[in-house]
Amino acid sequence: FTIFLGVALLQGVLTLSPIPVPEEEWAEFSRMLRDPSYRLPTTTRPRHYAVTLTPYFDVVPAGVSGLTTFSFDGEVTIYISPTQANVNEIVLHCNDLTIQSLRVTYVSGNSEVDITATGQTFTCEMPYSFLRIRTSTPLVMNQEYIIRSTFRGNLQTNMRGFYRSWYVDRTGKRWMATTQFQPGHARQAFPCYDEPGFKATFDITMNREADFSPTISNMPIRATTTLTNGRISETFFTTPLTSTYLLAFIVSHYQVISNNNNAARPFRIYARNNVGSQGDWSLEMGEKLLLAMENYTAIPYYTMAQNLDMKQAAIPDFSAGAMENWGLLTYREALILYDPLNSNHHYRQRVANIVSHEIAHMWFGNLVTCAWWDNLWLNEGFARFSQYYLTATVDPELGYEIRFIPEQLQVAMFSDSVDSAHALTDTSVNDPVAVSAHFSTITYARGAAILRMTQHLLSYDTFVKGLRQYLRARQFDVAEPYHLFSALDAAAAEDNALAAYRGITIDAYFRTWSEKAGHPLLSVTVDHESGRMTLVQARWERNTGVSRFPGLWHIPITWTRAGAPDFENLKPSQVMTGQSLVIDRGTRGQEWVIFNKQVSGFYRVNYDNTTWGLITRALRSANRTVIHELSRSQIVDDVFQLARSGVMSYQRALNILSYLRFEDAYAPWLSAISGFNWVIRRFAHDAANLQTLQNQIIGLSEAVVARLGFTEVSGGTYMTDLQRLHVMQFLCNVGHQQCIDAGRQNFLNWRNGSFIPANMRPWVYCTGLRYGSAEDFNYFWNRYIVEDLSNEKVVMLEAAGCTRDQASLEKFLNAIVSGNDDVRPQDHSSALSSAITSNDVNTMRAFDWLTKNVDQITRTLGSITSPLNTITSRLLTEAQMTQVQTWLDANRNTIGAAYNTGVNGIATSRANLQWSANRMSEFLRFFETGFVDDVPSEATTVAPPAETTVTPSTFPPTVAPATTPAPGSGNIAALSVVSLLVTLAINMVA
């Protein structure tokens, strides 16, 4: 879970709860059997829970048998009803609990009748985590039953369920217990129906030690009593109707560090007592964002339940970025605490971004909840959408409308562009592995991008009207996608919003995007003599250009032209439902056209050679900003991806990208950094050509460097400072000498006591260590150890791997796995990534370290799989691959599943070498010729046939449809080879 290792790590990972699964892992998960046996039967349903917990930390009270340190006792009472007749077994969840007693009763008159079947033992049945309860008589419809159980569990350290953490304040080391229940870990705290569809109300009681602060939970404390054993018992107000995964409680010595002191709209920030005013920014933004969501949805937050308040808490060890527990939002410290002097702009916007995401969940996820995780996008897609566009209304300075494209949409497209990608709605999600895998970039970022596209299709007002209808209709309930589609269709009908698109409904349109994986490449061929523009859609695949699973989408079409440029009107001119479409441009002669204005749709665009030449000419002109910044960003990203797949040669791609020499805007450069980083990785084994490529990149940075400079200036805008942070990190990495000199000098000044502006520290730290000594690293590491600001510690941790000193690298690696708490468990992954990937020379050094420390790494991380995968996928020579393979073979019996991980990583490294061998000539031709203006004369403006470098074997078998399938049909016939060749041949040049 990384925060700032280059731009790619900025893009969309941090707001997920739990941590999203990388798309590469999805391919492995998708091969697993999705076992519906993991789902609870729906024969009974809960109405209300009363839960009492008593946690024990490092001291066990005398006189209580069987207790161990870091454990808890619990009692739960669950009121349930059968949903059908003749139910003899109740099934709910439990995991890692010892059931001490359990009985099922019902009230008859003034007494309770026990119907628990005799002769049964109550255990948490694995792997399903089921607690089965047989009854002596069948349950009767319309009768309420009561399950009462006592149990015992352990406060684990794995950051799941009810777990323990610690921190250091003025008094020393403090223990605490907190929770993370999503997606299925409430069952580790108490027996329950641990699926989102089983909503109920909850009364929570916590019996804490007297010297702890008052317990924090979803609701305010209703009653406090002192028990005979001296403990304090705190009972909270009843929750709204909610799912188990949204419950939370914190037993700690926390204090309120920021408070709005508004009894009508209470909002507080909780944290350890030595963080000062670091909660003020999250409080300020939280209040504004909560009010903005209330206005957006027309549903006031504080009226959702009686006594509802809003609290946010900073957790030292937290597996997720943040969690949307109703009334108690929990965060990693680095993602909620902010120091204006010492936290950089990345964290300023990150705090706002994540607070917005979690607050949006109060409506999308809490008030209305996805019925099951197969439609998680109903929760997370809306929250990701809101965290950008709602935050943009509250604080426009943060630039979220611009940043959504490179940070979310383009990242989602990358993840969505492999054949193993999953659909937003995936009915095969049942088992825990599949559920965890569905917390993915596709679910979050693609979900948000499709919602953004839908808003442009309907208009803002109609879209909001539909969302309000959806929320009102499903409040305190669960939802399926058709509930959303129906509400949006009703709003569209009321506003006549789809009248221009004959036969289009939101239901039919949205299903092509939610039930189908992938997205289209829209290939545009312009006949400049006649003005006819031919559009062809086909599913995009990033490695070959052609998916093995063709499909059709309902594509909202927007476009503009040079003679009358209009990038502001994002209402689609038509919705393309078939394989092809012809549009009359309305003019004749050469002029550029650009489709998908401001990237308002979720699709890529390729053009014929002449049109690409005209676009390139426009981008290199003084009037390039006539083309919207987001469209320029789209062009950069599309060109990189078209070239990667082989649909476009790198010679042509670099010809187009040569315009970056004149570009200085934020979004195009973030797209360029991402694209260049992918290519640089594949040049890493070839020092001479890598140097040439890096020199080309440095040459392209003239305009952006001239605007940004290497130092922060007084009065600079937020977006300028943020862009400088990203651009300088990138340019120092590719060897820009002025950047390196500035970084080294600032690092030296810092060692001598000078202050470095927070927005410069990531690249200054990294550059200073990369070109520094062991003494520099030791000074840096000692400063890291004593640093108390959590997000500054993360910045330093992720720069530490930039050292090229071998002894310093080993010191860093040993610190990660030493168990001495210098690196917290939640930061192990990002720290290892920094150590292995920040310098190519570190890869084999890290491998040598791994081979000598397998046992210690396994004790700390659970296995060597993660670091081994990172190492083996970055090998640069056949000699390195042979060395690693030899070690894998020799240790196959002891490293288990990590063996296959290593073999697959070597295959990735070998594929990188082969890719370079296959494509290097295209780069060399551009290095030789430089930019070429290849627009043909007006006399030959018909799009010329393009050469192709893709052989027919690239394509799937021909499947010729007997009849034309209906748009949106689940049985869309595969495109023929001829159609695909036409699509790809538009711009495949040697």
From Swiss-Prot:
Domain of life assignment: Eukaryota
Locations listed in the record: Cell membrane
Keywords: Aminopeptidase, Cell membrane, Glycoprotein, GPI-anchor, Hydrolase, Lipoprotein, Membrane, Metal-binding, Metalloprotease, Protease, Signal, Zinc
Binding site for Zn(2+): 357, 361, 380
Top-level class of the enzyme under EC nomenclature: hydrolase
Swiss-Prot/TrEMBL cofactor(s): Zn(2+)
Membrane topology qualifier: Lipid-anchor; GPI-anchor
Residues annotated as binding substrate: 321-325
Feature type site, description Transition state stabilizer: 444
Family: Belongs to the peptidase M1 family.
Stated name of the protein: Membrane alanyl aminopeptidase
